């Protein structure tokens, strides 16, 4: 399961953060079906060293009103609003209705939302922060601040909450993004090329796929709400979502990836059978791959994972028991492989099971 994490959304009064990211992403611009809006001189970025911590939240000099609130959907959300905000402008019920109107799953019932003034938010999240999230607690303003609406902040932070409750082994969704979106965005291969930096809330914030996921979720939900204006200010344009990425994001929210799939098959090697058994392996998602093989007694069969070109050997299974062989590997952008079994020693039946993301 994803581990607890902290995120803070803050304002930077310069565009230096994105300068490096724009250069790094130039090679990726051609693949985008849509174009991100131009980034203004005021970019959004994370503030270093100011994560949401329970102690800071508890110590904040803020009086809250509200609590568990049942909305028109029948769902209950725990919303607390600062007394410093006028009741007519920021009621717990209003924000609870907004939250249950977001694209969401069952994770919404685990969330506690604190809506305050900008001063309240910055006393909890940091002096430049517009919002923050950690461990099922979300802090956001109830008023527009520096041209950023509270809805925009809440959508971004709720994206982190979704990732907190999604699984993407062998990685953590909150840093890499949920599985389907991360696969479409080729996060694994980008990390290997030093083009993405999971969990980096500092100088590589704009290339942090966890933040790119949160922004993709925000944009996806804004489109669902009929908002046509597009803003993409805090993450590298190389992560600006295609239609395929938006569809994958929606699926990650509404139909979360749950577990790997295991399939098994067998083949009998005899004196007149083919000397090599090839088995095609489809890998539509990135993640962990395992091959288990049971060979005949007295057999030392070669069980290899081979790339789609039929030539490159990715790895070979090793004995883990008298007749059992195993291979663990990672799928990182490859959409298919082959399992190649070559008999050595005693002939007979070989059983192969594959576990894919």
Predicted feature descriptions by range:
Residues 73-133:
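Auxiliary, metal-adjacent structural segments of Zn-dependent hydrolase domains
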Residues 301, 343-357:
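Edge beta-strands of jelly-roll/beta-sandwich modules across compartments, strongly enriched
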Residues 158-177, 213, 222-226:
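Catalytic Zn2+-binding segment of zinc metalloproteases
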Residues 11-21:
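Bacterial N-terminal signal peptides
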């Amino acid at each position: 399961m994803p581990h607890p994490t902290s995120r803070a959304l803050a304002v930077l009064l310069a565009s230096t953060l994105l300068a490096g990211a724009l250069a790094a992403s130039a090679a990726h611009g051609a693949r985008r079906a849509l174009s991100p809006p131009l980034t203004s001189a005021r970019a959004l970025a994370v503030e270093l060293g100011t994560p949401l911590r329970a102690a800071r939240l508890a110590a904040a000099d803020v009086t809250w009103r509200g609590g568990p609130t049942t909305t028109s959907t029948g769902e209950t959300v725990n919303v607390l609003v600062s007394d410093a905000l006028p009741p007519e402008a920021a009621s717990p019920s209003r924000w609870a209705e907004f939250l249950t109107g977001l694209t969401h799953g069952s994770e919404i019932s685990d969330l506690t939302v604190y809506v305050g003034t900008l001063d309240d938010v910055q006393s909890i999240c940091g002096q430049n922060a517009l919002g923050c999230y950690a461990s099922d607690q979300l802090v956001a303003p109830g008023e527009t601040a520096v041209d950023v609406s509270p809805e925009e902040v809440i959508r971004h932070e709720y994206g982190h909450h979704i990732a907190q409750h999604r699984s993407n082994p062998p990685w953590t969704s909150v840093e890499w993004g949920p599985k389907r979106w991360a696969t479409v965005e080729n996060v694994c291969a980008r990390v290997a090329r030093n083009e993405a930096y999971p969990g980096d809330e500092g100088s590589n914030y704009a290339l942090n796929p966890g933040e790119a996921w949160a922004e993709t979720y925000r944009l996806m939900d804004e489109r669902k709400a009929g908002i046509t204006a597009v803003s993409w200010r805090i993450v590298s344009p190389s992560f600006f979502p295609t239609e395929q990425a938006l569809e994958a994001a929606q699926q990650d929210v509404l139909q979360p990836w749950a577990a790997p799939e295991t399939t098994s098959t067998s083949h009998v090697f005899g004196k007149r059978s083919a000397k090599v058994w090839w088995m095609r392996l489809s890998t539509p998602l990135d993640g962990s791959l395992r091959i288990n093989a049971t060979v005949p007694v007295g057999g030392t069969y070669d069980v290899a994972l081979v790339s789609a070109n039929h030539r490159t050997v990715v790895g070979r299974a090793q004995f883990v028991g008298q007749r059992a062989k195993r291979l663990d590997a990672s799928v990182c952008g490859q959409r298919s492989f082959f399992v190649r079994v070559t008999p050595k020693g005693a002939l007979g039946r070989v059983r192969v099971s594959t576990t894919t993301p």
